[in-house]
UniProtKB/Swiss-Prot annotation:
Note on cofactor: Binds 1 Fe(3+) ion per subunit. Electron spin resonance clearly indicates the presence of Fe(3+).
EC number: 3.1.2.6
Phylogenetic placement of the source organism: Eukaryota, Viridiplantae, Streptophyta, Embryophyta, Tracheophyta
Superkingdom as given in the UniProt entry: Eukaryota
Residues that bind Fe cation: D128, H129, D201, H239
Boundaries of the annotated transit peptide in chain numbering: 1-64
Name the UniProt record assigns to this protein: Hydroxyacylglutathione hydrolase 2, mitochondrial
Length: 324
């Protein structure tokens, strides 16, 4: 088993240590322990313990105080670059899955753990987030939960949720947040007790989703809603896009030292075929260009007019990312 320890040579604000699993494609995050770790003042996130294929992976990254919870989160790669997330409550044995693009990887994981599936949660209607719904529902009798606005577009939906709803997953309160922009009916699912949010395709690490159905103004409001959460909130998004996103972000802010360190960390993880997710609210506020549309360097790089408001600037940044 290999161990990696990395510190940023430029700023020394970043430190990461991992034990690599022989099967890096599946990672399970256990946020039961409470630990304290401080790594500089710029960026922080909870200390997490990940487990995969029976071998433990220890991650110390932008650390502060972790949360105490019986909720386990297993990252499951699907399709080309999608992530689904299996949720398991240790106390009750309840299992859910967020955004199953396809059924087979979820079934394989549940077989390995000997677990059943109770809930299927969808952030939006796109096929690469709902493609496994019907097969999983038929196999396990799981209930499908999604946006009320998308109730006619989510396969097999049983329960429709709207902004402000609070739903209980095995004793864990889930706050439903409307986060349109990528699609009109997109929702994000926030677990305050675990400081974790599932953002689907609204927010990625260092980027946001394409504006297929919404407007820059809607996307800006959605991103602001997500980043109003505590800084140590872990963000679980729908795709592994972070490496390419980091290249775009650096093209706009080449002198951002936090971004430089994070981009180097991301490149190292991807070179070992390891996930870059979760990220944190604090990291994204420091590095994500879509959260920094008022930044002078970004505006200068894209020739965004001084008079342009944040929504207009976000639209210009999104167009530049589409063409990058």
């Amino acid at each position: 088993m290999q161990t990696i320890s990395k510190a940023s040579s430029a700023t020394s604000f970043f430190r990461c240590s991992r034990k690599l699993s022989s099967q890096p494609c599946v990672r399970q995050l256990n946020i039961r322990k409470s630990l304290v770790c401080r790594v500089m003042k710029l960026v922080s996130s909870p200390l997490r313990t990940l487990r995969g294929a029976g071998k433990s992976i220890r991650v110390s990254k932008f650390c502060s105080v972790s949360n105490v919870s019986s909720l386990q989160i297993e990252l499951v790669p699907c399709l080309k670059d999608n992530y689904a997330y299996i949720l398991h409550d240790e106390d009750t044995g309840t299992v859910g899955v967020v955004d199953p693009s396809e059924a087979e990887p979820i079934i394989d994981s549940l077989k390995r753990s000997g677990r059943n599936l109770t809930y299927i949660l969808n952030t939006h209607h796109h096929y690469d987030h709902t493609g496994g719904n019907l097969e999983l529902k038929d196999r396990y009798g799981a209930k499908v939960i999604g946006s009320a606005m998308d109730k006619d577009r989510i396969p097999g939906i049983d329960m429709a949720l709207k902004d402000g709803d609070k739903w209980m997953f095995a004793g864990h309160e889930v706050h439903v947040m409307d986060t349109p922009g990528h699609t009109k009916g997109h929702i994000s699912l926030y677990f305050p007790g675990s400081r974790a949010i599932f953002t689907g395709d609204t927010m990625f690490s260092l980027s946001c989703g394409k504006l297929f159905e919404g407007t820059p103004k809607q996307m800006l409001a959605s991103l602001q809603k997500i980043t109003s959460l505590p800084d140590d909130t872990s963000i679980y998004c729908g795709h592994e896009y972070t490496l390419s996103n980091s290249k775009f972000a650096l093209s706009l802010e080449p002198n951002n030292e936090v971004l430089q360190s994070y981009a180097a960390h991301v490149a190292e993880l991807r070179s070992k075929k390891l996930p870059t997710i979760p990220t944190t609210v604090k990291m994204e506020k420091a590095c994500n260009p879509f959260l920094r549309s008022s930044n002078t360097d970004i505006r200068r790089a894209l020739r965004i007019p001084e008079a342009a408001d944040e929504a207009e600037a976000l639209g210009i940044i999104r167009k530049a990312k589409d063409d990058f």
